[in-house]
Amino acid sequence: MTENPTTTAFNELQTRPLATILARNDWQNPAITSVNRLPSHTPLHGWRDADRARRGEPSDAVLSLDGEWQFSFFASPHQVPEVWLAADLSDARATPVPSNWQMEGYDTPIYTNVRYPIPVNPPFVPDDNPTGCYSRDIEVPQAWLETGRTRIIFGGVNSAFYLWCNGQWVGYSQDSRLPAEFDLTGVLHAGRNRLCVLVLRWSDGTYLEDQDMWRMSGIFRPVSLLHLPEQALADVRVHTELAPSLRHATLFSEVEVTPAACGLSVTLALWHGENEIASQTLPLGSAPIDERGNYAERVTLSLDVDNPLLWSAETPHLYRAVVTLLDADGMPLVSEAHDVGFRRVEINNGLLTLNGQPLLIRGVNRHEHHPEKGQAVDEAAMVQDILLMKQNNFNAVRCSHYPNQPRWYELCSRYGLYVVDEANIETHGMEPMSRLSDDPVWLGAYSERVTRMVKCNRNHPSIIIWSLGNESGNGATHTALYNWIKHQDPTRPVQYEGGGADTRATDIICPMYARVETDQLIPAVPKWSIKKWISMPGETRPLILCEYAHAMGNSLGNFADYWAAFRQYPRLQGGFIWDWADQAITRVEPDGSRWWAYGGDFGDTPNDRQFCMNGLVFPDRTPHPALFEAKHQQQFFQFRLVSENPLQIEVTSEYLFRESDNERLLWSIEVRGETRLSGELTLELGPQASRVLTLSDTGFSARAGDEEIWLHVRVEQPQATPWSPEGHLSAWAQWPLAAPLALPEPVAAGDAPQLEITDAEFVIRHGCQTWRVSRASGQLIQWSDDGVDQILTPLADQFIRAPIDNDIGVSEVERIDPNAWVERWKAAGLYNTEHRCLACDAQTTRDGVEIVAQHAYFVKGVADGPAILSRWRMVVDNQGALHCDIDIARSAALPPLPRVGVVCQLRGGEETASWLGLGPHENYPDRLSSACFSRWTLPLSELTTPYIFPGENGLRCNTRELNWNGWQAEGEFHFSLSPYGTRQLMETSHWHKLQPEAGIWLTIDGFHMGVGGDDSWTPSVHPEYLLTAREYRYRFTLRRRQG
């Protein structure tokens, strides 16, 4: 709770020595969350001009204190000398505010997910408690000293802090993610004023801030002074009500003035651009509340609005409400202004609705994190994230797991994103998680974090849901705070996942990582499949996954399954992917080279290594390939092939409110990646409308021998929007079309290849090509063309992959999960096999030379029979092509294989490769709905994905032809080309440490296991994407490039 001592008591404390103030030990007392901090309220700017307030121009009443402060660092608050309050210390260094001191060279950033970064002994924290001492000299305008009141506003300080001004103690605060304001009126004077802020890294609040993130400290959000007149607006709440017809609305503004005075009145004016829609002026004083009367300092104003433009993420129409306090003569004293969005959020008949329409949440979780600035995120970074989210078909964001800066909500309201605002509460590392949530000693601390969030942020139309916090179990505190919010703000639902995602403290079933079809029977809190959950007896609430599709590294497999379910079952209303961006930190070496660091790279303990990197984008916001899968599945236009002749498709708009007034549909028919027919038309669809479009009255006339015929459609925006550039691609689809039956064109017979047999090799020659197969190994050890070797290592079976994060799960050196795929592969010996050639024979046939080799793979040190058998049939034909037919048989004792394919190292050469298959981005068998079948060309550098923690990457599936360096591969296969071999990927901890090898590694897979992604700590690859068969067969052809 907030401690507000009597004036006499506090005046006595103000002048006490620093050591006396620190001896209060407020940071280890959950009953004290602040001292002398002002009550929470919606943001104030103190405009003296209502027009400037309406336009949102900078206020003369606000003085930013961002910039350089002097900073000294100590290992403990008790080491800070008293003299610091009067003058900077000799070791003080200029440090930017806002910033985290760990990003400025002090102390160590710590990344941990669940484990607390300190020994668990609430409310106590270690005596060794890193402490930052910030100081700055300021001058305030003389007019501010003569009249009115001046307060200082800290946007965010982690974890707790004390404030002094001119040597006098002003107050104390904790809760690192909400503003803290203090009145400085009595301590400011003319000339230089010295501000001193002592920030503690750890406090009892640390036990409530156990979020999965980097643990950093300091003044990391803006700091400013605000000057208000003696009679000022203390709080301004605005909210809207819509009639069921949506044609009539009322804007309410509940205003509080401090101090109350006779004769004051308040004006509420609503503006749309330069047009005033309506206004009202009322004297101060509320209607009677109870038998004891009314609030003299409050008034509620209301404006009726007909046919308002409604706010949604699709059509973010905003108005501006300006509230002005008038003196007894009707003269303006001060104004405040807020964006207003007319919208109604409800849960009706088991559906979350906005303006009467059921929402489909295309959401993502977002931490405030910047690779160079830590948790000090500026407006440019916020806008960058919002634009990328909108461009990739997201319509919602969850503030995981704490309130963001006020500017974030304003930007979401203006660009159009639905927001879940979440209280800064997580006790994931407690055992049980509910320990503090059910302890009345902590009730006040919990309560302030929830109630202050609501009071501060409730005016933002983008916020459609409140969240009580994250992963804190379920206690009586949650029920109490749920009821408080429902009483204070009945216009929004409340969600909370803790305690099983469906407790009485949530209006929405909001599980994390629940599967589509499979139950997870976790003790006490079973996690049902999402389809089952909504059908449980008596359950009528909507289900929205607060976290799903764990996007850690090479992930997001099975994502399409979620979206098929969302579209099939109305009460499955989407979810929030975990999460937006990799939380890595940029490190700069003395030579200027830069790389991205994760947990443990700073010597931080405890740490959870690379588990901070779960993003759809890299730290610099470059997309992961998984982002394209999310964009495609979430696209607002859905397509269906109706007929091939005439060529017709059906297009359905999933927009709820906007017409397709800026969309162009382009279509093409490709034959083996070459465009044969194309066209475009303007796409005109109303909200939620469908339309059949005829692309060609006569269909497509295929020629004899045509194959791989595909119809492609894409929707682009010809005009730029506030969030997208001209020509932005918003949706796409493709279908294979029927190919005519035809016999292949006969090929003139060429010269027969010649077979030479030596004691060691079978040597085959055809023209200027030579192939050598070792009789001992049964492997192709040389392929030369014009005397130039094409392969640097033998062409060999490959059954392993460099483990991806989803393969590793929670396994670490000190904590092994035997159920993780990588541990099962290790235990089965897949990474430690011994190859033996059982037989290798060659013969000349009518069509060429045939070599048949039998291979066996034994687990080293295991006396049992072979784990895997392979049979290769290699044929060099009279065209100089090498055909490889491969049969695989595996032991029933083996776990599912990561891959069934071949690998070799090729000589270097061309810088680009082209292929006919799925692309252009990386794709895997369970993550390929966004990839399109066509002919693609990319630089080799873009054929690998530089996941910060290296692993399997860069696969392109369903390939029919691959061309590189003068040769081509044909067949039906998946491939990758990489300068890094599997072993190096396995043995290297960071991408920047990889060293290009002598050539380029080629993998050709007949089969490849999925990557999974329902979560990253259980084996989440679905059965249909596991390689569990006992036998496999595939084939491919290698030849000199044709044409």
From Swiss-Prot:
Binding site for Na(+): 212, 611, 614
PROSITE patterns xref list: GLYCOSYL_HYDROL_F2_2
Residues reported in the UniProt entry to bind Mg(2+) 2: 607
Cofactor note text: Binds 2 magnesium ions per monomer. Binds 1 sodium ion per monomer.
Cellular compartments per GO CC: beta-galactosidase complex
Catalytic activity reported: Hydrolysis of terminal non-reducing beta-D-galactose residues in beta-D-galactosides
Family that this chain belongs to: Belongs to the glycosyl hydrolase 2 family.
UniProt-recorded name of the protein: Beta-galactosidase
Organism: Cronobacter sakazakii (strain ATCC BAA-894)
Lineage, highest ranks first: Bacteria, Pseudomonadati, Pseudomonadota, Gammaproteobacteria, Enterobacterales
Gene name for this UniProt entry: lacZ
